[in-house]
Every structure is written in structure tokens, then in C-alpha cells.
Amino acid sequence: MYNPQLNKNGELSHLLSVEGLPKAILNQILDTAASFMEVSAREVKKVPLLRGKSVFNLFFENSTRTRTTFEIAAKRLSADVINLDINKSSASKGETLLDTIDNLCAMHANLFVVRHASSGAPYLIAEHLQRVGRDDIHVVNAGDGRHAHPTQGLLDMYTIRHYKKDFTQLRVAIVGDILHSRVARSDIHALTTLGVPEVRAIGPETLLPKHLDKLGVHVFHDMNEGLKDCDVVIMLRLQNERMTGALLPSAGEYFRHYGLTPQKLALAKPDAIVMHPGPMNRGVEIHSAVADGSQAVILPQVTFGIAVRMAVMSIVAGN
């Protein structure tokens, strides 16, 4: 079956979504990321894999962790990194997305890292590059609308593998605003592909997408029930900027029912880890005692994200 992310040899040429990628490619990325962890421990944190290549960061939405870690990752691969200031670019004057891409291609771009509010924007760019015969230029999706955030999903998988080793023995809970979360979608596809036997979605009915059961996900509206005996708890923030209409009574009411407190975390396994893609809203989806506690691996997630993004860019570029 045709997959726009793969070249004619079945190798990863763009990373647009975790969905549809074979398990072997996910493991290739995770294994490559593990090898890059050593680079971050060196005095000189550089490898020459993208020397002479130009990486353009195109962030049409705000970002701290993702944009910064992509920039660090590209520089550690020895790439030349160009951060396009969208507010000062011709895009703010009405230039179309594909016209922007064509102009950057004329500047000898090799790889685009794209975050966009519109679902499917990275696919549009990848298809355009193929149509104009630029198979030598690669696209990495850094988050598109509510659709996907594949590198966040992959760094979450790396974090889980680092602490739990065997995916096939795990019970993983994803808690919060799953309806609007591109991270949740990427995590669910990655977890099921890697063989996690039980993925749980916990949240109010208004914040859970329909048909999660068709993805093999177990749905819980009671957080206490959903957390029982879980090995991994992934907390999500409320995506207020993507909500239309009143989906929640109040932040305080939400915290009472779905905020992760030490008491609720105690229902999971004693060695359960707590993850969060950031930014965190303390006192809304997570209590500070949990966020700063011994079971939280939120800051290691950020560290692992550099190695994972190094792996993704290196692999799509043909290394």
C-alpha cells in the first residue's frame, strides 16, 4: 500500500505521522536515538551526519520545547539551521504555504521541520515536493493541527522503553483532553504498533473522540478506575485554544475529577511513571507534588527528545 512517508525502497523519507509506519521503522528510530544519547554526553556534542545540509524550521504555531530541541538536534548533526520568523516572513503578507516552500527550495533547503495549525499541512508540502521532482528534500512534521505530533509520540515511546523495557507487558493510561490532542493520537498509534496490550483513555465524555474502541483503546470516564494497576500515566493539558463551545464547567471542577494527585497516582502500580508532553498546567491536570515527584519523568522526556529528533532527521536524510 502506498505510504507518502516512504521512498521506493520502503525507507523513511518524510516523517508525517506515526500512523501507518511499520514496527521495524519505529524500532529503527528508537535504536538510532539510543546511539545518539552518547553524543549528548560528549564534551563536543557534534557528529557530521548533516554537515553541509540546510534545515529550515517553519513554525506557524508557537513552541518552546519542540522548536528548541529540533534546533539543538540539527546543530548536533552539524546542519546549518535557519529559523524562519513567520510573523516577519512573506507568509504574513499573504504568500501561500507552497510558494513559501518553493522559495526556500530555491535557497537550497534540504529538510523542512513544519509545525502548522492546519491538519495535513506537512502532507501537502511532501506531496508538492514529489510533484515538482524534489525527492531530495525531506519533511518532518512537528505538529499539525489536531492530527499528529509524530516526534513527540516517538520520544514518548523512547521514554517508556528506557524505563519499562518491554512494551508487551504494559498497561498505559492517557488522561485528559484526548479529543484535541495530536500527541494522544500519535501515542496511541505508536503504542499499539509496538505491541502494548492495553491502552486506556481517561477523560470526560466531551473530551474523548468517538470510536476509540476501534483503535483497541479502553475508555474510562472515572479516573480512579482507569488508573488501577497502570504502568505508565501520560497526562495531557486542556487545549483551550482548539476548543469550540463550553466543554468543561471550570478548571477547578476538571482538576477535582481528572487532575493527577498523589492519592490518585497511588492507584497505579508503585513503580508507575508519569509523563507529560508539556506545557504543564499545574493545578489543572497535574498536582505539583506529582509533577515534581520521584515517579515523574517529564524532564527526561525533554532530554530524550533531542536524541529522537536527531535520529529522525538523520534517517530521513538517508543516513
UniProtKB/Swiss-Prot annotation:
| InterPro entries in the cross-refs | Asp/Orn_carbamoyltranf_P-bd, Asp/Orn_carbamoylTrfase, Asp/Orn_carbamoylTrfase_sf, Asp_carbamoyltransf, Asp_carbamoyltransf_Asp/Orn-bd
Q: Which UniProt keywords apply?
A: Pyrimidine biosynthesis, Transferase
What reaction(s) does this enzyme catalyze? carbamoyl phosphate + L-aspartate = N-carbamoyl-L-aspartate + phosphate + H(+)
Q: Which residues bind carbamoyl phosphate?
A: R65, T66, R115, H149, Q152, G278, P279
EC number(s) on file: 2.1.3.2
Identify the metabolic or biological route this protein is part of: Pyrimidine metabolism; UMP biosynthesis via de novo pathway; (S)-dihydroorotate from bicarbonate: step 2/3
SUPFAM superfamilies in the record: Aspartate/ornithine carbamoyltransferase
Q: Top-level EC class, please?
A: transferase
GO CC field:
cytosol
One GO biological process term: 'de novo' UMP biosynthetic process
User: Record-annotated residues binding L-aspartate?
Assistant: K93, R182, R237
Drop me one GO molecular function for this one: aspartate carbamoyltransferase activity
- Which protein family is named in the record? Belongs to the aspartate/ornithine carbamoyltransferase superfamily. ATCase family.
Report quaternary structure and partners: Heterododecamer (2C3:3R2) of six catalytic PyrB chains organized as two trimers (C3), and six regulatory PyrI chains organized as three dimers (R2).
Protein function: Catalyzes the condensation of carbamoyl phosphate and aspartate to form carbamoyl aspartate and inorganic phosphate, the committed step in the de novo pyrimidine nucleotide biosynthesis pathway.
Q: Read off the PANTHER family from this record.
A: ASPARTATE CARBAMOYLTRANSFERASE, ORNITHINE CARBAMOYLTRANSFERASE, MITOCHONDRIAL
Protein name listed in UniProt: Aspartate carbamoyltransferase catalytic subunit
Gene (UniProt): pyrB
